[in-house]
């Protein structure tokens, strides 16, 4: 993996996760930067890669796809839909259209305060028009999808 990183055509745009630079902190060369490397992020990256490989990439992709489809079906049952066209959707980040007359920010606030569920608002031209629902990594589970759908149903 490091050989692939070392041979890439373009360098990292930031020192924060420049794997070549960070490799120096792990004993592969001289220390280049005078500040402390983001060690906690290195450990988080290591652990996330370990978990992904432990689960198996094919299994991980299948789990994300399955939970995306579960969310899509549950939203349909609530009369809601994803805004991105089929074929342009990400299984991990789902843009849900906010129904007319619904207080987008108010629903997000109630989801957080009453149910402990945080979702994101739309950005740019989608501000106030969509909710961004993440199903990434460990958070991509049937339990989380069902919990979100149940909470959303209670608020609409």
What does each of the following model-derived ranges do?
Residues 125, 129-156:
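PLP-dependent enzyme catalytic core of the Aspartate aminotransferase-like
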Residues 79-83, 117-122:
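A short linear hydrophobic-aromatic micro-motif
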Residues 81-114:
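Conserved PLP-binding catalytic core of the aspartate aminotransferase-like
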Residues 1-73, 77:
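Active-site C-terminal subdomain of aminotransferase-like
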Residues 111-119, 152-156:
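A common structural junction motif
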Residues 68, 87-93, 124-132:
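Small/polar glycine-rich anion-binding or flexible loop at a beta-alpha turn
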């Amino acid at each position: 993996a490091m050989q692939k990183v070392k041979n890439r055509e373009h360098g990292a745009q930031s020192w924060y996760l420049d794997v070549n630079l960070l490799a120096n902190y792990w004993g592969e060369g001289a220390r280049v930067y005078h500040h402390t490397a983001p060690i906690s992020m290195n450990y988080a990256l290591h652990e996330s890669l370990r978990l992904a490989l432990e689960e198996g990439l094919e299994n991980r992709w299948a789990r994300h796809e399955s939970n995306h489809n579960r969310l899509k079906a549950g939203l349909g049952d609530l009369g809601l839909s994803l805004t991105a066209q089929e074929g342009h959707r990400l299984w991990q980040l789902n843009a849900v259209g906010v129904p007319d007359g619904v207080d987008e920010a108010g629903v997000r606030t109630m989801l957080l305060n009453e149910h402990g569920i945080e979702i994101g608002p739309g950005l740019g031209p989608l501000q106030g028009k969509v909710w961004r629902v993440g199903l990434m990594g460990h958070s991509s589970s049937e339990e989380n999808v069902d919990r979100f759908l149940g909470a959303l149903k209670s608020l609409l």
